[in-house]
């Protein structure tokens, strides 16, 4: 899931990083480790997926993965969600629909964006969790029939309403 909260990072006083800046971009928990390493002048290991937040100066592409079953990508404030349980896609324009109530996956005006985001999501998954793919597509499974099918787990967006995103 995600948290919509501010993140405050204070670099060391004697560093070359700018201070007292406000940046409005998406950050992941994975970004904390490489940011701390950079502030300590330690090179980031190659297998680390996060970014040094003190060096980001452009809008980033955000990738989300929950339980290796639910995935999302956000680019230019367009959010694509994919659930491998049931093989379902959702697409939202966060500029127009901040509450993610209107699924645009079948809107012809967004088809090219959906295809671009899907390609990026597959490439990202191929790089970091290739075991989730088969023939360049996510390995799918049947959606749960009811809440008893999922023990001690998040119900996902198949629980009651297929049209509502709960990847928050």
Locations of regions flagged by a protein language model:
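Substrate-binding rim/cap in mid-to-C-terminal beta-strand-loop elements of soluble/periplasmic
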Residues: 1-58
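Active-site beta-strand termini and strand-to-loop segments that position acidic
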Residues: 11, 73-76, 82-83, 94
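A structural signal for well-ordered alpha-helical segments within the folded catalytic domains
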Residues: 2-3, 27-34, 48-51, 75, ...
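Short strand-connecting beta-turns/loops that link adjacent beta-strands
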Residues: 58, 68, 85-87, 109
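Short acidic (Asp/Glu) and glycine-rich catalytic loops that position anionic groups and cofactors
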Residues: 12-15, 94-100
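Long, internal low-complexity/basic segments
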Residues: 104-168
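Short, acidic/polar N-cap/turn motifs at the starts of alpha helices
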Residues: 50, 69-70
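Two-metal-ion RNase H-like nuclease active-site motif
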Residues: 61-65
């Amino acid at each position: 899931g995600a948290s919509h909260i501010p993140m405050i990072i204070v670099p060391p006083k004697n560093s070359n990083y700018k201070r007292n800046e406000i940046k409005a971009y998406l950050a992941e928990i994975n970004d904390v480790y490489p940011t701390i390493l950079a502030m300590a002048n330690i090179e980031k290991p190659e297998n680390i997926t996060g970014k040094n937040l003190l060096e980001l100066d452009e809008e980033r592409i955000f990738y989300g993965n929950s339980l290796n079953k639910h995935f999302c990508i956000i680019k230019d404030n367009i959010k694509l969600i994919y659930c491998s349980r049931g093989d379902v896609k959702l697409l939202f324009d966060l500029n127009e629909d901040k509450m993610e109530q209107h699924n645009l996956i079948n809107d012809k005006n967004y088809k090219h964006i959906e295809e671009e985001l899907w390609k990026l999501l597959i490439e990202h998954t191929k790089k970091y969790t290739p075991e989730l793919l088969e023939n360049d597509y996510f390995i799918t499974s049947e959606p749960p029939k009811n809440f008893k099918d999922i023990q001690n787990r998040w119900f996902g967006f198949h629980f009651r309403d297929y049209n509502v995103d709960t990847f928050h």
